[in-house]
């Protein structure tokens, strides 16, 4: 008798494990963007694939492309299972505001910059899911609410912009259609050939919270974003002088 393939056997990653994978990928990405981009050793060709020169910088940035989809997926799960959606949204907005000066310094060396950090994108994605649920039975209100959110994302010029907000909403809407979510979702963002690999840990998600349970641990995870950006800014300033 043939054994049927059981996908649940491979679902071994908790939400906390995916958070740590996403965090590591994000930090690597930002190390590449902030420090390695100017480092000669990181831009030497290691090998070539289809006439494309692969460097350490390219590898680090490619790994970094996996972070955002995982964070978006975690956001949709948090939205579904949080005890208070209002508090969840407030926390996202709070850390968007906290992260803005570190983001501005890292990108321009100034306290004010033309684009906004990714927490604003996550917050707007949260609002998109919120109004999608609130106005399920009122298509007109849903349309104009979502339209307003997308316009705000364009005006704010938040990281990943309206495409990022749309990606979050798509993941939420396709939560019960894994194959469509993974294949179509990878085409939402740039470099779909790389982004598709971010759905590997997502597919391995076992719907368990994991070890990040307490409030201090949760806020420490949030704080890792502005803190590491600020650290990278100071390192870059010390090494490169800008």
What are these regions (language model features)?
Residues 1-242:
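Alpha-helical transmembrane segments and their immediate juxtamembrane cytosolic regions
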